[in-house]
């Protein structure tokens, strides 16, 4: 059976090439919103962090109807760190729309997601977006995209893909640059003509592969997947087959069934082959599980998800200021929250450690883990994390292997020398260098993942904010040797109390301060950064001794340099292997793992003697 009235597509793109805006426009022009309805920009990015950072983290499901054909659209993340989302979502669709910026052209994450789509033999429609930009170069971008297809071993059918030119912001698409157009109709028509309709046997045994998990506090866990064969009905008895252990089968009942319409889930009594549905009523449903008929339960193979490459320890905050600002502070709270994240994030790994209060959390990159940390912080959690470390492997001969990444950098010509020097120091190897438009140079490096830990902030400083850096995981390669991360030491408070202007004034001569007057500090807390390689202990709580001629009012004459406020990413980049980042809903504090100065010195002596 072929469902000619349905098309299932994923929209894939490099970060910030406009795919979420494109989906917004398709929603508007298909009549999802009332004419007088106020519509937020990027309505598909519902998560606060997504809106703030302008990125998509979680894949979203929506549906529009065009000329009696229902088009299920899935907006996928463009970041390689959230590749786990992309890989499994592609199993639900019959084709993809690849969105490429008309100026920037084919970029690294484009390569990452496109490779996954081509491996699954999905047909591709290429949408050259932002053609209204004055510096747009659509003809050159077409050549770049076709070159990328060839590099990724696309077959002849995939190479013969249609190109659509669009401006999602202005709401039009066209098949040729010379055409006149004021709507997205050419893109709608191309989707219906080129993307195959879903196929399956309506009368066969039911098979639904669960590709994503949603959660609703009223109905609990909701599994989302495509019906490959058979039908689903409300109150139907089915069997849930676990993808880890196919022999582990459980009889369950479907309490509610939904299809997607616009941005909403609509309750239905029955759904058939090709439909993307949401199912509630199954408490322990997981990503990768298959819902089957009880008569013949056969699991659908699950797309292998790329392994994590970076890990950090999440632990209970044990600083002297612990428990004062957070709502959830115990190891039980921390454990429950991390385990809950595993329900919806297949790329994440959480392991217990020897220490009851510490958990090893592994992910696909610094961004992946920093988004989790930021979400937990906003929910009221208080905890501490260690420096990110890469996950090593060994080959058959026992040689150490480490994750390697391809790093693409676009910088103004005058900064390229400094970037090459910095990345060479971090074991990066220059693979390619070419001039691009507007006085920029494009650099391509092969570099260990650990060489990029803590580099992004340095990169923005070196390029005065004008550089663009993108990375994509390549493969595991031979260990490249030790890397020296931070050349500056820390300013460490050696007395607990409140920071005072006089103490800060004396301390600022030693380096850059991270705190201001009135802030609470404790012994072992890092209050700033020195200009030299070694750590320096300072007393920021020091007060001036008063005399008849010296009164405390003379403190007002002391001028403090404004403190340097670190964002979460900057703080994660800054910390060294012997330091922790204390995270609370109100503050980020950096501290030494060993707070006692005497014990810390002994530990350093032992480390240096090894």
Regions found by a protein language model. Give the residues of each.
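Structural and coupling elements of P-loop NTPases
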Residues: 1-610
């Amino acid at each position: 059976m072929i469902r000619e009235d349905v098309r299932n597509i994923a929209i894939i793109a490099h970060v910030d090439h406009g795919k979420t805006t494109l989906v917004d426009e398709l929603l508007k022009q298909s009549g999802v919103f009332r004419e007088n309805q106020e519509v937020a920009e990027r309505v598909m990015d519902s998560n606060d962090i997504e809106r703030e950072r302008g990125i998509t983290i979680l894949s979203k499901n929506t549906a529009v109807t065009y000329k009696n054909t229902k088009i299920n659209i899935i907006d996928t993340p463009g970041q390689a760190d959230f590749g786990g989302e992309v890989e499994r979502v592609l199993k639900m669709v019959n084709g993809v729309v690849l969105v490429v910026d008309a100026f920037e052209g084919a970029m690294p994450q484009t390569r990452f997601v496109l490779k996954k789509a081509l491996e699954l033999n999905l047909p591709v429609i290429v949408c050259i977006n932002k053609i209204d930009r004055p510096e747009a170069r659509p003809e050159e971008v077409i050549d770049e995209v076709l070159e990328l297809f060839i590099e990724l071993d696309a077959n002849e059918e995939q190479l013969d893909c249609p190109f659509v030119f669009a401006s999602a912001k202005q709401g039009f698409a066209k098949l040729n640059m010379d055409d006149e157009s004021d709507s997205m109709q050419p893109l709608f028509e191309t989707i219906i003509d080129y993307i195959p309709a879903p196929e399956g046997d309506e009368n066969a045994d039911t098979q639904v592969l669960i590709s994503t998990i949603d959660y609703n506090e009223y109905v609990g866990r909701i599994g989302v997947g495509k019906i490959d064969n058979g039908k689903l009905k409300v109150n139907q008895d089915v069997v849930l087959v676990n993808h880890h252990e196919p022999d582990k089968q459980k009889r369950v009942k479907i309490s509610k069934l939904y299809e997607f319409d616009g941005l909403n889930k609509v309750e239905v009594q029955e759904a058939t082959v090709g439909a993307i549905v949401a199912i509630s009523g199954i408490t322990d449903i997981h990503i990768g599980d298959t819902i089957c008929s009880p008569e013949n339960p056969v699991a659908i193979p699950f797309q292998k998800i790329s392994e994590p490459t970076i890990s950090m320890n999440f632990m209970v905050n044990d600083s002297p200021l612990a428990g004062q600002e957070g709502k959830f502070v115990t190891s039980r709270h921390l454990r429950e929250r991390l385990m809950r994240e595993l329900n919806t994030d297949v790329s994440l790994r959480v392991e217990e450690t020897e220490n009851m209060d510490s958990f090893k959390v592994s992910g696909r990159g610094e961004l992946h883990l920093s988004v989790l940390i930021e979400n937990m912080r906003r929910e009221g959690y208080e905890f501490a994390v260690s420096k990110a470390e890469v996950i090593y492997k060994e080959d058959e001969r026992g040689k150490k292997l480490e994750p390697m990444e391809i790093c693409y950098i676009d910088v103004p010509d005058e900064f390229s020398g400094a970037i090459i020097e910095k990345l060479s120091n971090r074991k990066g190897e220059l693979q390619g260098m070419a001039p691009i438009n507007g006085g920029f140079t494009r650099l391509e490096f092969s570099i260990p993942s650990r060489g990029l830990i803590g580099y992004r902030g340095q990169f923005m400083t070196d390029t005065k904010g004008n550089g663009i850096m993108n990375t994509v995981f390549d493969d595991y390669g031979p260990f490249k040797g030790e890397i020296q991360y931070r050349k500056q030491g820390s300013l460490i408070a050696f007395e607990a109390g409140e920071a005072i202007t006089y103490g800060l004034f004396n301390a600022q001569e030693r380096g850059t301060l991270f705190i201001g007057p009135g802030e609470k500090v404790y012994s072992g807390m890092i209050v700033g950064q020195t200009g030299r390689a070694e750590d320096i202990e300072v007393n920021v709580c020091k007060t001036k001794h008063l005399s008849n001629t010296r009164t405390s009012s003379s403190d007002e004459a002391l001028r403090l340099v404004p403190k340097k406020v670190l964002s979460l990413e900057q703080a994660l980049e800054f910390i060294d292997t012997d330091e922790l980042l204390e995270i609370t809903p109100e503050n980020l504090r950096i501290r030494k793992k060993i707070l006692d100065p005497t014990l810390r010195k002994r530990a350093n002596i032992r480390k240096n003697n090894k």
